[in-house]
């Protein structure tokens, strides 16, 4: 919210781990980063474990990290205005994605599809995880907001379709250990 951004510090539920300062003690007690995730949803999964373990995430609004997910090129001004208006009219940020051209990496598509399944298996005792990245609440919304746009916007559609399928299969085959808060311990 605007009020939150005007404050110098605000507690939040989730952050990216790039440029974050993490307590080594908290990191160890929560089980460290899950290296199997490798790239996508590492932040969501770790932040959820941090909060469930009683720690808080503090955002300092005086600092900004400008980070992009892939190479993004704006479309014509007319197309930008159209898709941004559709997004605003329907109150759905996913439509705004069509206002720019994105170079879709099949490798990132693979990990995103694999990891959304894996992370939700691992954290299923504590509710859904990772869908907030894609402005949706569950797997069906993820299909509409991530999978389909990734394929439609891909330069190499065959590679992205294969990456999507392989990610789903590997995520479904994954068997992560269920994470649980260590009972009786209050860390923070």
Annotated model-derived regions:
Residues 3-22, 100-104:
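A recurrent flexible, glycine/aromatic-enriched loop bordering the glycosyltransferase active site
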Residues 20, 26-31, 36-69:
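A short, conserved alpha-helix in the catalytic core of glycosyltransferases
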Residues 25, 45, 114, 118:
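Short, contiguous clusters of charged residues that form electrostatic/catalytic patches at enzyme active sites
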Residues 42-43, 135-140, 184:
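Short, conserved alpha-helical segments within structured domains
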Residues 54, 120-124, 172-179:
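A general structural signal marking secondary-structure boundaries and capping sites
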Residues 56-160:
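Active-site-adjacent helix/loop segment of glycosyltransferases
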Residues 150-188:
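Membrane-interface aromatic/basic loop that binds lipid-linked glycans or pyrophosphate carriers
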